[in-house]
Amino acid sequence: MAHEPECPYAAGNVIKFHVKTPGGLEATAVAEIIKVFEPFTLSSVVLVRMACSSLGLEGNMVLKLFDRRFATQLRRDEKIRPWTPEIETEYYQFILDGGAAEFVTQLKEEEDSDDEASDDEDGDYEHSEDEDNDDEASDDEDSGDEEWSAAMDETYLHNHMLDLYKTEVQVYSNLKEIQGTDIPKLLASTLMSIPFPGQTSGDYTDVPGILLQYIEGFPLTDVEQYAPRESWQAICEDAIRIIHRISDLGILNEDVKTRNFIVREDTENAFKVTMIDFALCKFRQDYQDDYDWDKWKSIQDEEGAVGYVMQRRLKGGFSYCRSARYEKLDEEFRKAE
């Protein structure tokens, strides 16, 4: 595989993890990986064959693991060096020495401070791997910040991945009424233990994840290849309808991409769209009022992220018509543009 060394997520491998259904039933499950969805970005996504009859979890399902070690795009975006076993050894010692717990507390305190200064930067943390390129920036910042070690990087990533996992689980809970139709069914949450010598707790090493209904189909980006031209308009409109439905249920998706829609044949000569990937979402209750919510809806433009992109891609095969709700947002927030 093209991933970092010792990646366990390869076709044919068998993995073991704890499973908890939305109804609260729990069991230990073993699953065989039968397909890997590459490249890994924020999470490691694989198709597994489940055989957990005690919970009724049998057959092919999607397992999405929030594993910091193999979050290759996230590491690249955050300028964090690729994972190695040597880094893991350093991280384990950091955990045993109590450094990880202290660092997570520090991160949360800084995050709370950033939340209070809501108009400041989002609190993205600078990593010093490219130290020469960051000299000017560091001169302008508080000089008390220390260079992060590899163990600190891993602690930050673990904490960040846990937040992404919690967000995605909460989104699925909030969208329960459209599970199995417009989004996959959330079948269970999972936890995979990563033991190490001297370990007393898995708080900083265990890998959380979710088990999802497998939707067999093709990404919206490939609609030209798999669907007849006369169906493109309806398929793209269905994707936009799902965006509106999710918005109506109080979700703001900061990562709407056309590849995050799966299209499958529903009935003869018809297609159904399903949306996936909700780790980078916000919730209505996170915003002060309707004005604040609408402003960020306008900035994010979830509808346009599909409509404009697919209109350009399909070159006349799909005509995007701005919806009334987004025309209203444009009128209110984009007058100056």
Label every PLM stretch briefly.
Residues A2-R76, R81-E88, Y92-Q93:
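ATP-binding glycine-rich phosphate-binding loop
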Residues L47-M50, Y214, V263:
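Conserved hydrophobic "DFG−1" position in protein kinase catalytic cores
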Residues C52-S53, R68-F70, L191, E216-G217, ...:
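Conserved beta-strand elements of beta-rich interaction domains across eukaryotes
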Residues G59, T205-P208, K272:
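Residues on conserved beta-strands of the protein kinase catalytic domain
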Residues L74-D115, D139-I235:
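Conserved structural core of kinase catalytic domains
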Residues D115-S143:
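Long acidic, serine-enriched intrinsically disordered low-complexity regions
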Residues P228-D238, S247-N253, R259, V263-E337:
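C-lobe/activation-segment region of protein kinase-like
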